[in-house]
Amino acid sequence: MPELPEVETVRRGLQPVMEGAKIVAAEARRGDLRFPFQPDFAKRLQGQTVRGLGRRAKYLLADLSSGDVLLMHLGMSGSFRVIKQDDEETPGEFHYPRGKDSVHDHVVFHMSSGADIVFNDPRRFGFMKIIGRGEIEREPHLKDLGPEPLGNEFDAAMLATACAGKKTSLKAALLDQRVVAGLGNIYVCEALFRAHLSPRRLAATLATRKGEPTDHARRLVEAIHAVLNEAIRAGGSSLRDHRQTSGELGYFQHSFQVYDREGEPCRTDGCGGVVKRFVQNGRSTFWCPKCQR
């Protein structure tokens, strides 16, 4: 599933052709994705100007001139493609040419900017939903989300407070979207490695008995910031389905330190350890037992 860097990469790719442009027409080419489309979905979007395109955790939010918000989630395999009228592209180093088969092109936005925005989702776990601007805080998919890890409010003190007294593992706590929003398996593994913290460590150890942040909390927040920012600059990680809106692959997977590197040498200078994998809460965890404590 796309994580925060992949969704932010998509947002930045859509922003130039969506923000300030009008949705001339919208097509929903089937009745549902993960959930059924609202009966008047396409009609409500037609003629609306996109005033802004934001992101909350792994969700995209298009602010519409009607006062509504278009909530979008990529699901497991969803991707957006921007097709301009001239359809000219300058492929990057990691460009992956998408085929012409449009059987999985389920939603199309025809924009006044001259671009068609196509949502392709083979597994149909993505969804789109129109909500009122005043309903955002009550929206079930958004209301319980924790702070944005790249937001100004997310710091060691906030993370320590959220983890104080927790008896769960550090990795499980970071994957809890109520603790911090948008992190997934890949970037949690990578951040824990950079902070030299074991995924099995108790989350409560990020706080002192007085609830103040420990050194571990400060190192971890720095690592989360670094990993996410580097991944966004690299266009995210393309392991299966993620593509940028140009069709280009993300390439942060070439910078993985532990994720999907089972049996390979640890990249920490002087460590000499080997990357291991174990199943934790139903997901593969990659780590170096020698330098992550």
Swiss-Prot record:
The active site is at residues 2-3, 58, 283. Monomer. Belongs to the FPG family. Its cofactor is Zn(2+). It comes from Bradyrhizobium sp. (strain BTAi1 / ATCC BAA-1182). DNA binds at residues 104, 123, 166. PANTHER family: FORMAMIDOPYRIMIDINE-DNA GLYCOSYLASE. This is Formamidopyrimidine-DNA glycosylase. The lineage of its organism: Bacteria, Pseudomonadati, Pseudomonadota, Alphaproteobacteria, Hyphomicrobiales. Its EC number is 3.2.2.23, 4.2.99.18. Signal peptide: none annotated. GO terms for biological process: base-excision repair. GO terms for molecular function: 8-oxo-7,8-dihydroguanine DNA N-glycosylase activity; class I DNA-(apurinic or apyrimidinic site) endonuclease activity; damaged DNA binding; zinc ion binding. SUPFAM superfamilies: Glucocorticoid receptor-like (DNA-binding domain), N-terminal domain of MutM-like DNA repair proteins, S13-like H2TH domain. InterPro entries: DNA_glyclase/AP_lyase_DNA-bd (IPR015886), DNA_glyclase_Znf_dom_DNA_BS (IPR015887), Formamido-pyr_DNA_Glyclase (IPR020629), FPG_cat (IPR012319), MutM-like_N-ter (IPR035937), Ribosomal_uS13-like_H2TH (IPR010979), Znf_DNA_glyclase/AP_lyase (IPR000214), Znf_FPG/IleRS (IPR010663). A zinc finger (FPG-type) spans 257-293. Keywords: DNA damage, DNA repair, DNA-binding, Glycosidase, Hydrolase, Lyase, Metal-binding, Multifunctional enzyme, Zinc, Zinc-finger. Pfam families: Fapy_DNA_glyco, H2TH, zf-FPG_IleRS. Binds 1 zinc ion per subunit. It catalyses: Hydrolysis of DNA containing ring-opened 7-methylguanine residues, releasing 2,6-diamino-4-hydroxy-5-(N-methyl)formamidopyrimidine; 2'-deoxyribonucleotide-(2'-deoxyribose 5'-phosphate)-2'-deoxyribonucleotide-DNA = a 3'-end 2'-deoxyribonucleotide-(2,3-dehydro-2,3-deoxyribose 5'-phosphate)-DNA + a 5'-end 5'-phospho-2'-deoxyribonucleoside-DNA + H(+). It comes from the Bacteria. Involved in base excision repair of DNA damaged by oxidation or by mutagenic agents. Acts as a DNA glycosylase that recognizes and removes damaged bases. Has a preference for oxidized purines, such as 7,8-dihydro-8-oxoguanine (8-oxoG). Has AP (apurinic/apyrimidinic) lyase activity and introduces nicks in the DNA strand. Cleaves the DNA backbone by beta-delta elimination to generate a single-strand break at the site of the removed base with both 3'- and 5'-phosphates.
